[in-house]
Amino acid sequence: MSIWYGANVADESELRLCGDVAGKRVIELGIASHPNSIDIALGGAKAMALDPDVQAITALRAAAERHEVKVECHQGDLADIGFATSASVDLVIASHSLAAVDDLPRVLRQVHRVLKIGAPFVVAMQHPVATMFATDHSLRYAYGAASLTFSDLYMAFERTNFRFDVVHELSDRRGRDPIAPTVLVVRARKLGD
Protein backbone atom coordinates (compact mmCIF):
# COMPACT_ATOMS: atom_id res chain seq x y z
CA MET A 1 0.00 0.00 0.00
CA SER A 2 1.31 3.42 -0.94
CA ILE A 3 -0.23 6.09 1.28
CA TRP A 4 0.99 9.53 0.13
CA TYR A 5 2.45 11.76 2.84
CA GLY A 6 3.81 14.51 0.61
CA ALA A 7 5.79 15.24 -2.54
CA ASN A 8 9.25 13.68 -2.69
CA VAL A 9 9.16 12.19 0.82
CA ALA A 10 8.80 8.67 2.19
CA ASP A 11 5.39 7.03 1.81
CA GLU A 12 3.59 4.22 3.63
CA SER A 13 5.69 1.51 1.97
CA GLU A 14 8.68 2.90 3.88
CA LEU A 15 7.12 4.33 7.07
CA ARG A 16 4.58 1.55 7.78
CA LEU A 17 2.30 3.62 9.97
CA CYS A 18 -1.07 2.23 8.87
CA GLY A 19 -0.40 -1.50 8.85
CA ASP A 20 -2.54 -4.04 7.01
CA VAL A 21 -5.90 -2.45 6.22
CA ALA A 22 -7.65 -5.51 4.78
CA GLY A 23 -11.13 -5.81 6.24
CA LYS A 24 -10.82 -2.56 8.22
CA ARG A 25 -12.90 0.61 8.14
CA VAL A 26 -10.72 3.56 7.13
CA ILE A 27 -11.50 7.25 6.65
CA GLU A 28 -9.44 9.62 4.53
CA LEU A 29 -10.06 13.00 6.13
CA GLY A 30 -9.56 15.50 3.33
CA ILE A 31 -8.71 14.01 -0.04
CA ALA A 32 -4.97 14.22 -0.72
CA SER A 33 -3.64 15.26 -4.12
CA HIS A 34 -2.84 11.57 -4.51
CA PRO A 35 -6.16 10.11 -3.24
CA ASN A 36 -5.15 7.75 -0.44
CA SER A 37 -8.61 6.21 -0.24
CA ILE A 38 -7.97 4.48 -3.60
CA ASP A 39 -4.91 2.70 -2.16
CA ILE A 40 -6.87 1.95 1.01
CA ALA A 41 -9.66 0.32 -1.02
CA LEU A 42 -7.13 -1.58 -3.13
CA GLY A 43 -5.69 -2.86 0.16
CA GLY A 44 -9.03 -4.47 0.99
CA ALA A 45 -10.44 -1.91 3.43
CA LYS A 46 -13.85 -0.31 3.49
CA ALA A 47 -12.64 3.09 2.33
CA MET A 48 -14.48 6.29 3.20
CA ALA A 49 -13.48 9.84 2.28
CA LEU A 50 -14.63 13.22 3.55
CA ASP A 51 -13.76 16.52 1.88
CA PRO A 52 -15.37 19.98 1.75
CA ASP A 53 -14.60 20.35 -1.98
CA VAL A 54 -17.24 18.95 -4.35
CA GLN A 55 -14.68 18.79 -7.18
CA ALA A 56 -12.33 16.66 -5.06
CA ILE A 57 -15.21 14.26 -4.33
CA THR A 58 -16.12 14.09 -8.04
CA ALA A 59 -12.49 13.40 -9.01
CA LEU A 60 -12.20 10.70 -6.32
CA ARG A 61 -15.37 8.96 -7.54
CA ALA A 62 -13.99 8.93 -11.09
CA ALA A 63 -10.64 7.56 -9.86
CA ALA A 64 -12.40 4.85 -7.84
CA GLU A 65 -14.35 3.83 -10.93
CA ARG A 66 -11.15 3.68 -13.02
CA HIS A 67 -9.50 1.48 -10.37
CA GLU A 68 -12.68 -0.60 -10.00
CA VAL A 69 -12.91 -0.06 -6.23
CA LYS A 70 -15.62 1.31 -3.99
CA VAL A 71 -15.00 4.42 -1.91
CA GLU A 72 -17.83 5.85 0.18
CA CYS A 73 -17.59 9.61 -0.46
CA HIS A 74 -18.96 12.40 1.75
CA GLN A 75 -18.87 16.13 1.08
CA GLY A 76 -18.67 18.37 4.14
CA ASP A 77 -16.55 20.03 6.78
CA LEU A 78 -13.75 17.78 8.08
CA ALA A 79 -15.44 17.61 11.48
CA ASP A 80 -18.70 16.34 9.94
CA ILE A 81 -18.02 12.65 10.49
CA GLY A 82 -21.62 11.85 11.41
CA PHE A 83 -21.72 9.12 8.75
CA ALA A 84 -19.54 6.96 11.03
CA THR A 85 -20.88 5.66 14.32
CA SER A 86 -18.92 5.97 17.54
CA ALA A 87 -15.95 3.60 17.95
CA SER A 88 -16.53 2.00 14.53
CA VAL A 89 -13.43 3.07 12.58
CA ASP A 90 -10.04 1.32 12.59
CA LEU A 91 -7.89 4.07 11.03
CA VAL A 92 -8.17 7.74 10.02
CA ILE A 93 -5.67 9.36 7.66
CA ALA A 94 -5.33 13.12 7.10
CA SER A 95 -2.65 13.97 4.56
CA HIS A 96 -2.11 17.73 4.23
CA SER A 97 -5.72 18.54 5.08
CA LEU A 98 -5.60 19.83 8.66
CA ALA A 99 -3.64 23.05 8.05
CA ALA A 100 -6.71 24.82 6.66
CA VAL A 101 -9.02 23.72 9.48
CA ASP A 102 -10.37 26.61 11.57
CA ASP A 103 -11.29 24.51 14.61
CA LEU A 104 -8.71 21.74 14.97
CA PRO A 105 -9.91 20.64 18.45
CA ARG A 106 -13.41 20.05 17.03
CA VAL A 107 -12.01 17.86 14.24
CA LEU A 108 -9.88 15.93 16.73
CA ARG A 109 -12.87 15.36 19.03
CA GLN A 110 -14.88 13.94 16.12
CA VAL A 111 -12.01 11.70 14.99
CA HIS A 112 -11.66 10.51 18.59
CA ARG A 113 -15.39 9.73 18.68
CA VAL A 114 -15.35 7.50 15.57
CA LEU A 115 -12.08 5.64 16.22
CA LYS A 116 -11.93 2.43 18.20
CA ILE A 117 -9.83 2.57 21.38
CA GLY A 118 -6.14 2.22 20.49
CA ALA A 119 -6.80 2.86 16.79
CA PRO A 120 -4.41 5.17 14.92
CA PHE A 121 -4.91 8.61 13.45
CA VAL A 122 -2.12 9.29 10.92
CA VAL A 123 -1.53 12.94 10.04
CA ALA A 124 0.86 14.43 7.48
CA MET A 125 1.30 18.17 7.17
CA GLN A 126 3.83 20.75 6.11
CA HIS A 127 6.44 20.83 8.84
CA PRO A 128 5.97 23.90 11.09
CA VAL A 129 9.61 24.90 10.59
CA ALA A 130 9.36 24.55 6.79
CA THR A 131 6.60 27.16 6.73
CA MET A 132 9.13 29.73 7.94
CA PHE A 133 11.24 29.64 4.76
CA ALA A 134 10.76 30.77 1.16
CA THR A 135 11.83 28.49 -1.70
CA ASP A 136 15.24 30.22 -1.80
CA HIS A 137 15.71 29.32 1.92
CA SER A 138 15.40 32.93 3.06
CA LEU A 139 13.45 33.47 6.25
CA ARG A 140 9.87 34.41 5.41
CA TYR A 141 7.96 34.11 8.73
CA ALA A 142 8.72 33.78 12.41
CA TYR A 143 8.07 30.33 13.86
CA GLY A 144 4.33 29.91 14.43
CA ALA A 145 3.32 32.95 12.37
CA ALA A 146 2.24 30.94 9.31
CA SER A 147 1.14 27.64 10.87
CA LEU A 148 0.65 25.75 14.08
CA THR A 149 3.77 25.15 16.11
CA PHE A 150 4.64 21.59 17.03
CA SER A 151 3.65 22.30 20.63
CA ASP A 152 0.25 23.66 19.45
CA LEU A 153 -0.31 20.45 17.50
CA TYR A 154 0.90 18.20 20.31
CA MET A 155 -1.26 19.90 22.93
CA ALA A 156 -4.36 19.79 20.70
CA PHE A 157 -3.93 16.01 20.40
CA GLU A 158 -3.24 15.60 24.13
CA ARG A 159 -6.33 17.60 25.10
CA THR A 160 -8.52 15.40 22.92
CA ASN A 161 -7.19 12.16 24.44
CA PHE A 162 -4.70 11.06 21.78
CA ARG A 163 -1.14 9.92 22.39
CA PHE A 164 1.61 10.28 19.79
CA ASP A 165 3.45 7.00 19.32
CA VAL A 166 5.37 7.89 16.13
CA VAL A 167 6.73 11.22 14.86
CA HIS A 168 8.64 11.54 11.56
CA GLU A 169 10.24 14.73 10.26
CA LEU A 170 10.71 14.10 6.54
CA SER A 171 12.92 15.99 4.14
CA ASP A 172 12.59 16.35 0.39
CA ARG A 173 14.62 13.52 -1.15
CA ARG A 174 15.81 15.76 -3.97
CA GLY A 175 17.76 18.10 -1.69
CA ARG A 176 21.21 17.23 -0.39
CA ASP A 177 21.36 19.37 2.74
CA PRO A 178 17.87 20.55 3.57
CA ILE A 179 17.60 23.61 5.77
CA ALA A 180 14.52 22.12 7.49
CA PRO A 181 12.27 19.08 7.24
CA THR A 182 9.44 19.64 4.76
CA VAL A 183 6.80 17.27 6.12
CA LEU A 184 5.76 16.27 9.63
CA VAL A 185 4.04 12.88 9.92
CA VAL A 186 2.60 11.73 13.23
CA ARG A 187 0.67 8.69 14.31
CA ALA A 188 -1.54 9.27 17.33
CA ARG A 189 -3.51 6.55 19.08
CA LYS A 190 -6.92 7.02 20.61
CA LEU A 191 -6.82 6.59 24.36
CA GLY A 192 -9.97 5.56 26.29
CA ASP A 193 -13.28 7.40 25.95
Question: Where are each of the predicted segments found?
Answer:
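Conserved class I S-adenosyl-L-methionine
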Residues: P120-A145
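Class I SAM-dependent methyltransferase SAM/SAH-binding core
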Residues: R25-D80
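A short acidic, Gly/Pro-enriched loop at the edge of an enzyme's catalytic core
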Residues: A79, F83-V92
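A short SAM/SAH-binding and catalytic strip from SAM-dependent methyltransferases
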Residues: D90-P105
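A short glycine-rich, Lys/Arg-flanked "PGG" loop and its adjoining helix->strand segment in the class I
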Residues: P105-P120
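Short alpha-helix
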Residues: A145-V167
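Core SAM-dependent methyltransferase catalytic element
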Residues: T160-F162, D177-D193
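Conserved alpha-helix/loop element of class I SAM-dependent methyltransferases that forms part
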Residues: M1-R25
